């Protein structure tokens, strides 16, 4: 069963967008590695001084293997001045109301 991964870090969402647009090849490389480890869906969100990543993964282990060995993510986070990421995982609940 898949898991939802939520990553939150302090940072400027505009800097994240700027970096991603200026480094699209690096972003695609990271995405390719994520696919190899089982990402199902991925999206960045931004709020007041916060960057949030919402992903669905085949497994928590797949995400951890990807994140622990992906060298470009720490470089990107340092460049944009993001804070230490807080990562949480959630499992789907069987509530008979999925859309």
Residue ranges and their predicted role:
Residues 1-71, 79-99:
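Short S/T/G/P-rich N-terminal loop/turn motif that feeds into the first structured element of a domain
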